């Protein structure tokens, strides 16, 4: 998908402040507005696509995040490639893994690539943990190759209760190790207790966020993206 070209418009407004009577000299304060578009790619699963439980269209965490950032003066040109049931090593509804989605979404001028997920990698062979590590490494390598100057933000999958199954912890640990090896910023929602004791944020299926859950995700993720783009 093509995205609008990045451009910068520097606009300086001179604001006159009158001191005393009209005959007095005026002082001026320059105001600079920065209209850069920050190109960002997002790779994810059904937590990003949204589901019947919530988060479809403008109610997705991505759409909410772009709105929140725009309100803070950070404008985003995004390519979002997400697929239900997909992971780094497990194909999704249309047969794609995260590496395929990376090839589709990441562009040479990207400033940031965000990876979110995936709990779907529980479906990989637990007897061969190196297979997942290899899939993750290949995905990050592809992102680096396609967007050499981009920062990578890797967000491991959350779990909605404090009782986290072993396979999820292994996925988290693999992602953390590979993110550090790739020089990426790693975020651990399990350690940070995202969604824990917040059942009102999860849909009736007990798995996917509802609309309020997507708003919660945007509140968590928008500052992370802002930090990578503007510090």
From Swiss-Prot:
Q: List the Pfam families hit by this protein, alphabetically.
A: Lipase_GDSL_2
Supply one GO molecular-function term. carboxylic ester hydrolase activity
Q: What is the effect of changing residue 46 to A?
A: Loss of activity
- State how changing residue 87 to A affects the protein, per the record: Retains 50-55% of activity
Activity dependence on pH, as recorded: Optimum pH is 9.0 (with pNP-decanoate as substrate).
| Keywords per UniProt | Cell wall, Hydrolase, Lipid degradation, Lipid metabolism, Secreted, Serine esterase, Signal
Q: State the EC number(s).
A: 3.1.1.-
Instruction: Show which residues constitute the signal peptide.
Output: 1-20
Catalytic reaction annotation: a fatty acid ester + H2O = an aliphatic alcohol + a fatty acid + H(+); decanoate ester + H2O = decanoate + an aliphatic alcohol + H(+); an octanoate ester + H2O = an aliphatic alcohol + octanoate + H(+); a dodecanoate ester + H2O = an aliphatic alcohol + dodecanoate + H(+)
Q: How does activity depend on temperature?
A: Optimum temperature is 40 degrees Celsius (with pNP-decanoate as substrate).
Query: Some GO term, biological process aspect, for this entry: which one?
Result: lipid catabolic process
GO cellular component terms, alphabetically, are: extracellular region
Q: Where is this site: Transition state stabilizer?
A: 87, 120
Give the induction text. Answer: Expression is up-regulated under nutrient starvation (in strain H37Ra).
Record-linked InterPro entries: GDSL_Rv0518, GDSL_Rv0518-like, SGNH_hydro, SGNH_hydro_sf
How would you summarize its activity regulation? Activity is inhibited by the serine modifier phenylmethylsulfonyl fluoride (PMSF).
Protein function: GDSL lipase that catalyzes the hydrolysis of p-nitrophenyl (pNP) esters. pNP-decanoate (C10) is the preferred substrate. It can also use pNP-octanoate (C8), pNP-dodecanoate (C12) and pNP-tetradecanoate (C14). Has lower activity with pNP-butyrate (C4), pNP-palmitate (C16) and pNP-stearate (C18). Does not show phospholipase A1 activity. Might help bacteria to utilize available lipids for its growth as well as provide resistance to various intracellular stresses by cell wall modulation resulting in enhanced intracellular survival.
Give the record's family classification: Belongs to the 'GDSL' lipolytic enzyme family.
Q: Which PANTHER family match?
A: GDSL-LIKE LIPASE/ACYLHYDROLASE, PUTATIVE (AFU_ORTHOLOGUE AFUA_2G00820)-RELATED, GDSL-LIKE LIPASE_ACYLHYDROLASE, PUTATIVE (AFU_ORTHOLOGUE AFUA_2G00820)-RELATED
Miscellaneous notes: Expression in M.smegmatis alters colony morphology and growth kinetics, provides resistance to SDS, lysozyme and anti-TB drugs, increases the total lipid content and trehalose dimycolates, and enhances infection ability and intracellular survival capability of M.smegmatis.
Protein name as catalogued: GDSL lipase Rv0518
State the organism named in the record: Mycobacterium tuberculosis (strain ATCC 25618 / H37Rv)
């Amino acid at each position: 998908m093509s995205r609008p070209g990045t451009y910068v418009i520097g606009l300086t407004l001179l604001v006159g402040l009158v001191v005393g009577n009209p005959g007095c000299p005026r002082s001026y304060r320059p105001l600079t507005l920065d209209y850069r578009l920050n190109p960002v790619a997002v790779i994810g699963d059904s937590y990003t696509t949204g589901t019947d439980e919530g988060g479809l269209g403008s109610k997705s965490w991505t759409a909410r995040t772009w709105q929140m950032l725009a309100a803070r003066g950070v404008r985003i040109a995004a390519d979002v490639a997400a697929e239900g049931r997909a992971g780094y090593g497990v194909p999704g509804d249309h047969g794609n893994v995260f590496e395929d989605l990376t090839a589709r979404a990441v562009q040479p001028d990207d400033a940031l690539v965000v990876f979110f997920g995936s709990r779907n990698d529980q479906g990989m062979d637990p007897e061969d943990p190196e297979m997942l590590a290899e899939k993750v490494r290949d995905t990050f390598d592809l992102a680096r190759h396609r967007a050499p100057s981009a920062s990578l933000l890797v967000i491991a999958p959350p779990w909605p209760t404090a009782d986290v199954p072993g396979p999820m912890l292994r996925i988290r640990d693999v992602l953390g190790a590979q993110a550090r090896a790739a020089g990426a910023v790693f975020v651990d929602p399990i350690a940070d207790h995202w969604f824990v004791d917040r059942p009102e944020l999860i849909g009736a299926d007990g798995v996917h966020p509802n609309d309020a859950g997507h708003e919660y995700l945007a509140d968590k993720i928008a500052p992370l993206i802002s930090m990578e783009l503007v510090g």
